[in-house]
């Protein structure tokens, strides 16, 4: 186990998460007692207690007053906020994780983009107009793309879609910085935003579904060609 955390709390958090991931602390089992675990990791009990509370909030553990701390099956109890952690833990599975993430984005965005353009066209156009001034480099496009999808999610009138995008932000923007280094990807995205703006202006809401699906397919083709050069820094760094 190689841990690169920059603080005692970060070290303890990574130690416990990696132990859960590697089945040293299997789902359904009881975590060692606080004193034993703090000595094992090499941190104070106060630090450990703070870390355990944070991991419980993220779904890794269940803490109940007067009972031992239980290890959860994180696939069943955690949220989107652990995406980057999963990417760090299992780099070999990152391509599949990203494919799943992008598939979810396409599937839900066919719904909220159509709703945004139909029910709140002025808000949708305001979001899409931000593409007019974007600088032609990867970082700018990564932020723009995330903010356009997120903005349209909230413009749909259903904030739950926006919260889902919030949960994807970390890994989503890291992927974007790699993906949008490709000029073809930037050009495709600009064409997509322009097409959505035109559909909104024309009131052609019935064409949104196919437009979004086509963009998901075409951007996926570019992404798959780029995966062989996937960088190793898509996961978060140690705390």
Curated annotation (Swiss-Prot):
Homodimer. Residues 6-74 form the HTH gntR-type domain. One of its GO terms (cellular component) is cytoplasm. GO terms for biological process: fatty acid metabolic process; regulation of fatty acid metabolic process. This is Fatty acid metabolism regulator protein. One of its GO terms (molecular function) is DNA-binding transcription factor activity. Residues 34-53 bind DNA. SMART domains: HTH_GNTR. Its main location: cytoplasm. PROSITE patterns: HTH_GNTR. The lineage of its organism: Bacteria, Pseudomonadati, Pseudomonadota, Gammaproteobacteria, Enterobacterales. Pfam families: FadR_C (PF07840), GntR (PF00392). InterPro entries: FA-response_TF_FadR (IPR014178), FadR_C (IPR028374), TF_FadR/GntR_C (IPR008920), Tscrpt_reg_HTH_GntR (IPR000524), WH-like_DNA-bd_sf (IPR036388), WH_DNA-bd_sf (IPR036390). Keywords: Activator, Cytoplasm, DNA-binding, Fatty acid metabolism, Lipid metabolism, Repressor, Transcription, Transcription regulation. It is found in: Cytoplasm. The gene is fadR. PANTHER family: FATTY ACID METABOLISM REGULATOR PROTEIN, TRANSCRIPTIONAL REGULATOR, GNTR FAMILY. Multifunctional regulator of fatty acid metabolism. Represses transcription of at least eight genes required for fatty acid transport and beta-oxidation including fadA, fadB, fadD, fadL and fadE. Activates transcription of at least three genes required for unsaturated fatty acid biosynthesis: fabA, fabB and iclR, the gene encoding the transcriptional regulator of the aceBAK operon encoding the glyoxylate shunt enzymes. Binding of FadR is specifically inhibited by long chain fatty acyl-CoA compounds. NCBIfam families: fadR_gamma, PRK04984.1.
